[in-house]
Amino acid sequence: MAYIEGNTGKWEYVIGLEIHAQISSKSKLFSGSSTIFAANPNSQVSYIDAAMPGMLPVLNKHCVHQAIKTGLGLKAKINKYSVFDRKNYFYADLPQGYQISQFYYPIVQNGTMEIPTSTGDLKTIRINRLHLEQDAGKSMHDQSPHYSFIDLNRAGIGLMEIVTEPDISSPEEAAEFVKKLRNLLRYIGSCDGDMEKGSMRCDANISVRRSGEPLGTRCEIKNINSIRNIIKAIEFEAKRQVDLLESGEEIIQETRLFNADSGETRTMRLKEEALDYRYFPDPDLLPLVISDELINELKANLPELPDQKIEKYTKEFSLSKYDAEVIVADESVAEYFEKAANECNPKMLTNWLTSELFGQLNKASIGINECKITPSNFAKLVKLIENDTISGKIAKTVFEIMFETGKAPDKIIEEKGLVQVSDNNVLNTVIDEVIAENPESVEGYRSGKDKLFGFFVGQVMKKTDGKANPTLVNQLLKEKLSS
């Protein structure tokens, strides 16, 4: 467990998260308006989104399915009966004067997610609920020095709000939870998880306490937009609360904003309670009733999820848990790996994938989907190394050409004349030449200077332009030098 070091001793973090995940859907939660990102302001607004009188909301079935699939991925209970409520508050970018949400009867409850801790153990984080709600519009303050403008393109887009219990005990655990949740949503296809574009936003509820004491007063940090900022915001806010408590002051329950430039949080507004929002069932929407048949159908069509892939890679491919987690962290990488792993040694493939390929992708600032090397050609390269057709050194040269051109490795080897020399007669001839040319070094090696062995290997490789089979060279050299 992580602690905050105060002037009067240690304090514990108590953290709960609320994740707002924009549902991957072509249309909004209650209207047919488009959800395309970065469209011209107010170009994707229906009468419902603009809260024009007389227009009734119609629930988007696809958004409901996405929420159910996410709930199944979180090992949660799917409520067969849920209700939409009106959350009443006034804000300029909320034209209805209320947000349609689910307060009393959410669609999903009681899920769990396991995250790795600093000790290497797994920790279970309880998911209190997942509910459906509409997003608000966007206030724009940088268009004029005198006026603010409203863009309603985002208004009405479907969100899943995923709320944890206060089970998180450090900023790093919070970051791990968000990373793992984001990966799960991407595998399911229910949210793209792009925090930079705002399609996934994180609110953190933070309090501090002495070990064994009751929960303290919490403050909520709104709309944290990156994994790195989650850690920074929680660290700063917890330290701020400790400083106040140690100086004899009280924590005021409030909503705060995190400034990424200064690394500080500041007051946004006093924290509201549920009563302030005057929740009541939306009279324009019927209760949502979900059948067992629908739940079972969606469950049967779920893709293989990250934890399942990690288990498969460690068992079927004998990868370490760490390597499996690195590959599974990106669905596209996992898909690429599986296509190649069926054609070559998975462990050797993993080494080349996570070192050489990742290095080149980072250098070129591209994703694996843009890589010119097909999984099949990558597997061919690994097999050529495995069967000693080429050495590791030659393989790196071949790989670089493959990355630039997309050519098959065997074609490159043929064009460049890079086939590894594994003929004993040819290698013995070269070794005899090296020994004859270096009598003093031979005498030195035979008198106990073992480090000279590397010199002989280097000379053989030089004479063969690096094409000699290094394993065979070592074996033949030892035989020649010891005779």
UniProtKB/Swiss-Prot annotation:
<dbReference type="InterPro" id="IPR003789">
    <property type="entry name" value="Asn/Gln_tRNA_amidoTrase-B-like"/>
</dbReference>
<comment type="subunit">
    <text>Heterotrimer of A, B and C subunits.</text>
</comment>
<dbReference type="InterPro" id="IPR017958">
    <property type="entry name" value="Gln-tRNA_amidoTrfase_suB_CS"/>
</dbReference>
<dbReference type="InterPro" id="IPR006075">
    <property type="entry name" value="Asn/Gln-tRNA_Trfase_suB/E_cat"/>
</dbReference>
<comment type="similarity">
    <text>Belongs to the GatB/GatE family. GatB subfamily.</text>
</comment>
<dbReference type="GO" id="GO:0006412">
    <property type="term" value="P:translation"/>
</dbReference>
<dbReference type="GO" id="GO:0050566">
    <property type="term" value="F:asparaginyl-tRNA synthase (glutamine-hydrolyzing) activity"/>
</dbReference>
<dbReference type="InterPro" id="IPR023168">
    <property type="entry name" value="GatB_Yqey_C_2"/>
</dbReference>
<dbReference type="GO" id="GO:0070681">
    <property type="term" value="P:glutaminyl-tRNAGln biosynthesis via transamidation"/>
</dbReference>
<dbReference type="Pfam" id="PF02637">
    <property type="entry name" value="GatB_Yqey"/>
</dbReference>
<dbReference type="InterPro" id="IPR042114">
    <property type="entry name" value="GatB_C_1"/>
</dbReference>
<dbReference type="GO" id="GO:0050567">
    <property type="term" value="F:glutaminyl-tRNA synthase (glutamine-hydrolyzing) activity"/>
</dbReference>
<keyword id="KW-0648">Protein biosynthesis</keyword>
<dbReference type="Pfam" id="PF02934">
    <property type="entry name" value="GatB_N"/>
</dbReference>
<dbReference type="GO" id="GO:0005524">
    <property type="term" value="F:ATP binding"/>
</dbReference>
<dbReference type="InterPro" id="IPR014746">
    <property type="entry name" value="Gln_synth/guanido_kin_cat_dom"/>
</dbReference>
<protein>
    <recommendedName>
        <fullName>Aspartyl/glutamyl-tRNA(Asn/Gln) amidotransferase subunit B</fullName>
        <ecNumber>6.3.5.-</ecNumber>
    </recommendedName>
</protein>
<comment type="function">
    <text>Allows the formation of correctly charged Asn-tRNA(Asn) or Gln-tRNA(Gln) through the transamidation of misacylated Asp-tRNA(Asn) or Glu-tRNA(Gln) in organisms which lack either or both of asparaginyl-tRNA or glutaminyl-tRNA synthetases. The reaction takes place in the presence of glutamine and ATP through an activated phospho-Asp-tRNA(Asn) or phospho-Glu-tRNA(Gln).</text>
</comment>
<dbReference type="InterPro" id="IPR017959">
    <property type="entry name" value="Asn/Gln-tRNA_amidoTrfase_suB/E"/>
</dbReference>
<keyword id="KW-0547">Nucleotide-binding</keyword>
<keyword id="KW-0067">ATP-binding</keyword>
<keyword id="KW-0436">Ligase</keyword>
<dbReference type="InterPro" id="IPR018027">
    <property type="entry name" value="Asn/Gln_amidotransferase"/>
</dbReference>
<dbReference type="InterPro" id="IPR004413">
    <property type="entry name" value="GatB"/>
</dbReference>
